[in-house]
Amino acid sequence: MNQIKQIPVIIITGFLGSGKTTLLSSILKKKENQKTAVIINEFGEIGLDHALIEHTDENIVELQSGCICCTIQGDLKKTLIDLFDKMMTGRISSFNRILIETTGLANPVPIIHTLMSSIDLIRIYSLDGVITIVDAVNGGKTIDLQEESIKQIALAEKIILSKTDIVDKDETKSLIYRIKEINPVAQIISISFGNIKNKE
């Protein structure tokens, strides 16, 4: 029996109001991201344009861009297996990567644990990394007040610093210093108006 080529999974976490939903919405609309499945909490929060919708199937929406948007039904393991089964039986278009959006200040550890501890999921999927979006305006305050934000930063391979265009450069440098104290190896990318501006 041929071994299934594992599908990479990227977890996207982010502080509340950091621009995570805006980023995901942008990903869904771009042709170059076709064959990407995005798992979100509810369709309403992503602001899907009905003109871009090809067809729907229960908790799954297929877009003209070739992306698949799916809401979590029950638990993550069930949702991931269901997505794969529907792809294999031709009920949805094929996808070659998955992005999972976490809610607000959710701890990404349970998602990582689910992906790495379930034999059923390990056969199909591989964890390809964690991306954390940090709001440059309120990032320092969030780190001070929310323990989960520290976990999000600590586990990330990439950290996207949003709203840097409306924050003083010294404030941004100070926040980057704090982020590097928590996670010295993550790549830090600044974003302005939704575009990648520079890398630290």
What are these regions (language model features)?
Residues 43, 164, 193:
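Short, ordered loop/turn segments at secondary-structure junctions
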Residues 42, 101, 156, 162, ...:
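Residue-level signal for inorganic ion chemistry
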Residues 2-11, 18, 22-142:
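Nucleotide-state-sensitive switch-loop elements of NTP-binding domains
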Residues 110-117, 125, 136-149, 153, ...:
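Non-catalytic interfacial helical region
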Residues 2-3, 151, 155-158, 167-200:
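C-terminal accessory "lid"/substrate-recognition subdomains
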Residues 8-18, 22-24, 56-57, 156-159, ...:
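Conserved N-terminal glycine/acidic-rich loop preference
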